[in-house]
Every structure is written in C-alpha cells, then in structure tokens.
Design a protein with these regions (language model features):
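Bacterial N-terminal signal peptides that target proteins for export
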Residues: 2-19
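Subset-of-secretome marker
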Residues: 3, 32-275
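Short hydrophobic/aromatic segments of transmembrane alpha-helices and their interfaces
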Residues: 19-20, 206
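C-terminal motif of bacterial Sec signal peptides marking the signal peptidase cleavage site
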Residues: 26-30
C-alpha cells in the first residue's frame, strides 16, 4: 500500500485500451487495489532530504492540491487530460494516427462521480469511406451495456499516471540539485508491473529489476514529472514511460456536460467499445 493517494495501477492504460478497441473496430469496418487519499502533499525543500524516496513519494498528488493537468506516455500510447478530486472526475484524451490510411482518431472520456461520457472524432479522412458516424457531442455510456465495464476509465484516485507505485518500487533514490531525483526501479514489483504493463515488463526479463528513472518536483513541492528509461529487450526497442503533472489548483474543474453538449450513447458506440 502506498503512502500517497493513487489511482489503481493501469488507470491510464485502460483508457488507452478502450481507444485500441475502437481503432480495431474502425479498421475492420473501415491494476491492483485502489489507492487511498490518506497521504499529504509535499513541501518545497532546498536541501537534500534524509530519505529521498519518502520525500519523492510525498510529492505525488494526493487529492489536496485541487484540479490539475496530466499527460502520460507508455510503450503504445499517449494520453493527456485533467484530474479533479473534488468532482471525483477525470477527463482524458488520446489521439492515434492510422499508419496505413493516414487518418487520426481522437478519443476522449469524461468521468464525473459514477457517470461516464465518451467523444470520438476522426480527422484527415478525406477520400475515406466506411468510418462510423458518431455525434459530435459527449455520449453518456451505460456501463451495464459494456461487455467489459473495466475497459473504460473510472475515478480511482488522483495519481492516474501511477507515479506512486513506480516510486514505491524504487530500490535506489538519490536527490540531485534543483529538486531533481534519480534512481533505479524494480519493475517486477506487482503494482509497478501493472502500472507500466505486465507484458512489457515480462519481456524485459532480468533487466526489469534495474530500470533507471528520473523525477522532478516543483517549487511548490508537487511532482511535475517522472520518466522511466525502459531498455531494449529481445526484439523490442527501448522506450520511455513518462508521467507529467501540471497546473495544480488552477486546471479547469470538471462537471457533467449539460444541455446540447451531451446525449445518450447510440448503439454504434457500444458496438465499437464491445468489439
């Protein structure tokens, strides 16, 4: 169990997984237990901490910082959005370009409390036919109509990039100048593996036990970035896992869309998500 509030390992990855499901359907047609919010945010420090690992964990967002922006990158996807602890909400978006046909799918999920909406937009589609026609509005989903309800995001804590589980799995942490940290993470730890991707971690073999990372903490004591430099293994190329948090307390607050901005999801939306 981590010392700071976190999202369940893989929260962002499930959002990317839902996007992958939509892409697969489009082309055919044309984590561990939830964390707690019991930790406290960090405070700025100008001198090295006696325990750098605990100092870095204390910088992971815990829900007391207000709404903030995030972005994330793993082996297969890039995501960005907003986390709003007061609304128990997340807004996340991913954009993926189809290498064969050249069009881009931009998919967004909005979660507020127990409700969830989806929005899908295709760009660069000139000359293409067979793409699904969906409303250009937020489509509210009924989770009971999803084959796998866990394939779509839910609000499970503020650390949607799973920085906490990764830092917790660090075997060495050293504090550098300018609030920068560096060390080594053992990705075979269960929660860290779920956060980064269990298949990707398994492919690393013994190298998964010695993955270097760097992290930066802002002047306000809050984590601003965490980067894992994942080495090449077998036929897999080296890649980076990146989490960035920004605009603590100043990001837009989230709320359920109303009026003409939303509608119930049509049958086609469920067909896409259910594959």
């Amino acid at each position: 169990m981590m010392t700071n509030g976190t999202g369940r390992a893989g929260t962002v990855r499930r959002g990317a997984g839902a996007l992958a499901a939509v892409l697969a359907t489009t082309l055919l047609a044309g984590c561990g237990p939830a964390g707690t919010d019991s930790g406290s945010g960090g405070t700025a420090s100008t001198s090295p901490s006696a325990n750098p690992k605990q100092a870095l964990l204390a910088a992971v967002p815990d829900g007391s910082e207000g709404a903030f922006r995030f972005s994330g990158k793993d082996a297969t996807s890039d995501l960005s959005g907003v986390v709003d602890p007061a609304a128990k909400g997340i807004d996340l978006t991913a954009a993926v370009k189809d290498p064969e046909h050249g069009f881009t799918t931009r998919m967004s999920f909005l979660v507020v409390q127990e409700r969830i909406w989806m929005k899908v937009k295709f760009t660069g589609t000139d000359g293409l036919t067979g793409l699904p026609k969906l409303p250009n509005r937020w489509m509210e989903l009924d989770r009971s109509r999803l084959t796998d309800p866990d394939a779509t995001p839910t609000y499970e804590g503020v650390d949607v990039g799973n920085a906490g589980p990764i830092i917790q799995a660090a075997t060495t942490v050293e504090e550098k100048a300018d609030r920068t940290y560096a060390g080594v993470v053992d990705l075979t730890a269960a929660e860290a593996a779920k956060a980064v991707g269990e298949e990707e971690v398994a492919a690393l073999g013994d190298a998964a036990r010695q993955v270097p990372f760097t992290a930066v903490v802002g002047a306000d004591g809050n984590l601003t970035s965490l980067t894992l430099d994942v080495p090449a293994a077998g036929t897999a190329k080296a890649w980076t896992y990146v989490v960035k948090y920004a605009d603590y307390g100043s990001a837009p607050k989230l709320a359920a869309p109303g009026g003409d901005a939303a509608q119930p999801a049509p049958k086609l939306a469920y067909q896409m998500l259910n594959g």
